């Protein structure tokens, strides 16, 4: 929704909250439903109402539990039956520096200040552990914003008696906990408040009158920031950035001005701004964001511009370069198809408002930020939260290279008349075996990112995946596919729950970058083999339809399962007798965990 895109009108959002919600719920978007518990150290009602808008816009339909005013500690430590039965999917602890209970005094000794610090840390740590034990769900915790005033002036930052120093030390303790606990996430309230303007943010009037820990007008900025973490946890991040060239990655028009005439580099303020934006884009690539070009240009001119000696980006930084004179909405759609991702996974960055509007109206779900002035490009993409990082794996570092190799595979496929011959030519081998610790982060990440080849679309938090990993009641398989072009990484996951002599499939997913490679048959062969080893006689498969997973509606039929149930909502149940199964993979050589690093 345009009204909820950065930069938004906070006053408008607050005023039109009800009508915006009504419009979002009526837009026909398929959303995942999530329960969110908000434990507040201050008034949270308007925060929750505004957060709901941003989550609906991100494809999440939230149901909220709100603690009573300042009852965050009690709810965390001693939840009542209402909260226990609510069973949140995520807990957000909204505390601020207003909730620090014992500040340093100028007369305190170092030991006394350290004791106060540890008391605060222990209070929060006890809450976090209690929530983890009782609810087994992700926790989002604000860090602390800096104080509105500094009693010691600049000395407040480094003197242990200063509140600024005390809050900084508390924040460092929070960060240390986050580094050691995978399902624990810090919401950077300190940054958001500073970005907004601490003087306005911390206006005492709103605390004294309404017990708000921020000014009323800051609530949309705060809720927007929180929504980024929630949508990232639940797999709603964007995956690719499609960029225009002229006046987006450099100043000027390369076809008219020539390579020597475009503005990029260190010579002028404008050229520096474009260089900084290119540098930022290259940093996004290092996070696993797929970079593509979508520009109305001659291909040769585009390549020449990207090879400018003062630029930070080069042609090989991009997986796909569409520099032609086709409509950009068509190029975006083709880019999505070639990457095997949905169009709503793409962010399109273009300085031209007319081109932006065409893509915005023609490509449903694609993010199209208003790129207003090169000096604002980085801020616009950064603050929009398209690529909020909550997990990071080795595969993220290699993602652009993996997609490039897929392009090489596609080119080779075109030279074969028989598809099976093409598959054999890839010289594929796979590691398919029980989960091992080194891949748990990637496996968890896949469950929250894979939407198309995913029969149940069940999501797992790191804590939930750890529980599955340790439970002998499951059969677990991950699949890692390698071919002559390179390593695709972990691309498939199957989780089945043993139920007597039956196995119920809780999860079956595969990355779209290895579609049509017969990897699913290799996974099935290994699953049946494992079932035979442990005495499982039947495998029950389940398909739950979503707006994005139609491609696997007939997966179990293709596997040779028999349909046993079909419901009005389109969900189906399937069954396979293990004794009747014959192997179906004939093109991938399969190994176990002893070849995991192959």
Question: For each predicted feature, which ranges?
Answer:
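Extracellular glycan-modifying ectodomains
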Residues: 1-242, 249-250, 255-261, 354, ...
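A conserved beta-strand-loop-helix scaffold within acyl/acetyltransferase catalytic domains
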Residues: 431-513
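Basic, amphipathic juxtamembrane/active-site segments
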Residues: 254-279, 364-371
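Acyl-donor binding region in acyl/amide transferases
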Residues: 484, 490-567
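Substrate-recognition element of Asp-dependent hydrolases with the DxDx(T/V) motif
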Residues: 276-307, 321-322, 359, 439, ...
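Conserved Lys-Pro-Asp/Glu-containing loop-to-beta segment of HAD-superfamily phosphomonoesterases
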Residues: 332-353, 359
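Short hydrophobic/aromatic-enriched beta-strand-loop microsegments
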Residues: 61-64, 315-319, 366-373
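Terminal substrate-recognition subdomain of acyl/acetyltransferases
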Residues: 360, 364-426, 529-598
